[in-house]
Regions:
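N-terminal export signals
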Residues: 1-13
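Intrinsic-disorder/low-complexity coil detector
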Residues: 4, 15, 36-40
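Short N-terminal segments immediately surrounding and downstream of signal-peptide cleavage
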Residues: 16-34
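Solvent-exposed N-terminal domain segments of exported/luminal and surface proteins
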Residues: 31-176
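Short, intrinsically disordered, charge-balanced linker/junction segments flanking boundaries
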Residues: 181-186
Length: 186
């Protein structure tokens, strides 16, 4: 959930609910997920999304005026990443304010597409690929989560270290497939 301070609910298939939000709720979600078989997250199947390649995603821009906490006294804003052909599994974004959570829904008008036909062709409930927390200057981010498991953060000098996965299991074990978590809800 996005709140001040920022915390992530990062579990496969997490389905937080709107309303009261606290650590007990996160624990209950984790217990419920652990008690049932794994179900892969929803993948968006869309011919329009299939067209959003590397070059095209560089042209799709989040509108800074639509950022979470834009126009408030918060020193940070949160911008969102658009889905594309490399990231087709949306993450759910929840905002926690005054101890209550609410889901933040994707809207086309949050992005500048540069291609009006593409914007119209994309599903209305597309979802987000992830988010980034912007520095007070609004020009650079200091934390980003995108896709199933990618994240990065900058240090005190605003320099990124290595990009990373949240956790990886059996990365060098012969005969075993690598496993890693999926970020599905924040």
């Amino acid at each position: 959930s996005l709140g001040l301070p920022l915390g992530a609910c990062a579990s496969a298939g997490a389905k937080p609910t709107e309303g009261r939000f606290d650590f007990e709720q996160v624990s209950a979600i984790a217990r419920a997920l652990a008690a049932k078989p794994y179900q892969p997250p929803r993948t968006i199947e869309s011919a329009a999304l299939d067209r959003v390649d590397y070059d095209m995603i560089q042209k799709i821009r989040f509108q800074p005026a639509k950022a979470l906490w834009a126009g408030t006294d918060s020193p940070f804003t949160v911008q969102f990443f658009h889905l594309h052909q490399g990231v087709k599994q949306p993450v759910r974004i929840y905002v926690v304010e005054d101890g209550r959570s609410r889901e933040l829904r994707y809207r086309r008008d949050m992005f500048s597409y540069g291609d009006a036909e593409l914007a119209k062709a994309l599903p209305a409930d597309l979802g987000f690929a992830g988010f980034r927390v912007m520095n007070p200057n609004g020009e650079t981010d200091w934390l980003a989560f995108q896709g199933a498991s990618y994240f990065r953060t900058a240090g005190a000098e605003d320099q990124y270290g290595l990009s990373a996965r949240g956790i990886a299991i059996d990365t060098a074990v012969p005969g075993k497939a690598e496993e890693f978590q999926l970020f599905t809800a924040f």
